[in-house]
């Protein structure tokens, strides 16, 4: 069955939260997401004004998705790729690249002028983004702090 790429509704996204659980359990992430945390993450994304959600569907079932959130900066109206996840059995088949392209096309139509994301800076994930014409920032890095 062919993969269909289209916008995803909030309900479809919430019903597909298990994609996050499955995708992030595998290397290189090794993250143990609960389904409740995944649902909460999808809820956060889809209730953000101007959230752009695209998905890959195998028949009626989503096999992957990408979420973009608006982020205006000195460069102008941009979109932040907040999540992209593919079911493990569908990874490394071009679906992620197609989702990124679809998200970029939709963002361009909506008037966005740049796209950015945060991810690992080395390894297969970095190679994946570079193969999709993303470049690492020479100016920025990610800082975090645990709140206790």
Language model features by range: what are they?
Residues 10, 21-43:
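Conserved GNAT-fold acetyl-CoA-binding loop/helix
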Residues 71-81, 91, 137-139:
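A conserved beta-turn-beta hairpin within the catalytic core of GNAT-like acetyltransferases
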Residues 55, 61-70, 80, 85:
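Conserved beta-strand in the GNAT
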Residues 43-55:
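A short helix-loop-beta-strand connector motif used in the catalytic cores of GNAT acetyltransferases and
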Residues 97, 109, 121-139, 145:
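Conserved active-site alpha-helix within GNAT-family acetyltransferase domains
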Residues 100, 107-120:
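Conserved GNAT acetyl-CoA-binding A-motif
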Residues 86, 92-105, 131:
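Conserved acetyl-CoA-binding loop-helix of GNAT-fold acetyltransferases
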Residues 2-18:
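A short beta-loop-alpha structural element at the N-terminal edge
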């Amino acid at each position: 069955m062919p993969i269909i790429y289209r916008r995803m509704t909030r309900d479809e996204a919430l019903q597909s939260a298990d994609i996050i659980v499955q995708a992030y359990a595998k290397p290189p992430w090794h993250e143990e997401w609960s389904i409740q945390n995944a649902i909460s993450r999808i809820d956060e994304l889809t209730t953000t004004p101007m959230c752009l959600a695209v998905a890959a569907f195998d028949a009626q079932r989503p096999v992957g998705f990408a979420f973009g959130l608006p982020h205006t900066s000195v460069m102008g109206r941009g979109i932040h790729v907040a999540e992209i996840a593919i079911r493990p059995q569908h990874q490394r088949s071009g679906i992620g690249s197609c989702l990124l392209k679809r998200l970029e096309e939709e963002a361009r139509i909506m008037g966005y002028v740049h796209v950015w994301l945060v991810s690992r800076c080395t390894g297969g994930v970095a190679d994946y983004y570079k193969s999709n014409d993303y470049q690492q920032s020479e100016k920025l890095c990610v800082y975090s702090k645990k709140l206790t």
